[in-house]
Amino acid sequence: MAKLHRWKVMHTQPAQIRPGKWITPNTGDQGFPDLVMVHPIRGTIFVELKATKGVVSNTQWDWINALEDAGCEVHVWRPKDLDKISARLAQ
């Protein structure tokens, strides 16, 4: 959907290193949002993606709060948010 509206997208995905053990092979503070999307007119968005019952961790909240304090637009999006996501990406 983001590509349809010409957003540049960076999606960080975890890798399974052994059964039940997942890591994201990035350096830096833990909890950085899953998506960073940039559009030359529509701005920059940081997004934490969660499953329907997924819980935002304390380290993820630390990043969300730090980014918001810095004036960034940050969202936690779930599958139920599809209409809201579509509207934001189109505006």
Language model feature labels by segment:
Residues 1-91:
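Catalytic phosphate/metal-binding cores of nucleic-acid and nucleotide-processing enzymes, i.e., regions
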